[in-house]
Amino acid sequence: MTDIRLYMLQSGTLKCKVHNIKMNQGNGADYEIPVPFFLITHPGGHTVIDGGNAIEVATDPRGHWGGICDVYWPVLDKDQGCVDQIKALGFDPADVKYVVQSHLHLDHTGAIGRFPNATHIVQRSEYEYAFTPDWFAGGGYIRKDFDKPGLKWQFLNGTQDDYYDVYGDGTLTTIFTPGHAPGHQSLLVRLPNSKPLLLTIDAAYTLDHWEEKALPGFLASTVDTVRSVQKLRTYAEKHDATVVTGHDPDAWANFKKAPEFYA
């Protein structure tokens, strides 16, 4: 039987400015952030959380992403796509049962449509917004990454479906955390022999956001962003969870990376 494990992986980095990540900070200084994604192995079928950057940006960033490359430049090797990394760990892409999308921004959609038997779980509000985003958010959504024929989608409905238990056994729970994006969700991972891990994803890019010292450089709603962090802080304390922020280069360095894992 397959052990329940959490693998932390990275699909390259994004080069940007500090103020793109921490609002009104950095005085224009350069900043480079990791682009994490996650694999949960499970006897009921594996789950990929997000998937990082689409592999296409390894060879043609501007052709795939367009003008947003002027703000966020992807650094990705050809072997750093999520499918190749999961194969390198010895897992068959056909055994991935779920692709869970925290949201649909361009640095989180690398797994969509890459796993032939996967159901893609996303908030309905995020999916709908991604097709018709507001002008200030449009560059963050690459339609060809998620508007693909033949995909199996499962839509969650905000607070109505909050704390959705993906496997039905407590291993993976979604937490509705709008703000950074209208339909953002974070994840709680419970493992047999480790403390729970709270994957904030982009509800908190960095520990500065988590500790309420800065707002993220991009958000759809300031009020929702702040309240989602407060919600997660309460949840993390309740479950004594280890917090994994979305793009913090310093904090990310402290976690085990694949092929090491949490179990």
UniProtKB/Swiss-Prot annotation:
Residues holding Zn(2+) 1: 103, 105, 180, 202
Enzyme nomenclature, EC number: 3.1.1.81
Keyword Metal-binding: yes
SUPFAM superfamilies hit by this protein: Metallo-hydrolase/oxidoreductase
A Pfam family per the record: Lactamase_B
Annotated keywords: Hydrolase, Metal-binding, Plasmid, Zinc
Cofactor(s) required for function per UniProt: Zn(2+)
InterPro entries (alphabetical): AHLLactAttM (IPR054889), MBL_superfamily_lactonases (IPR051013), Metallo-B-lactamas (IPR001279), RibonucZ/Hydroxyglut_hydro (IPR036866)
Protein family according to the UniProt entry: Belongs to the metallo-beta-lactamase superfamily.
Protein known as: N-acyl homoserine lactonase AttM
Upper classification of the organism: Bacteria, Pseudomonadati, Pseudomonadota, Alphaproteobacteria, Hyphomicrobiales
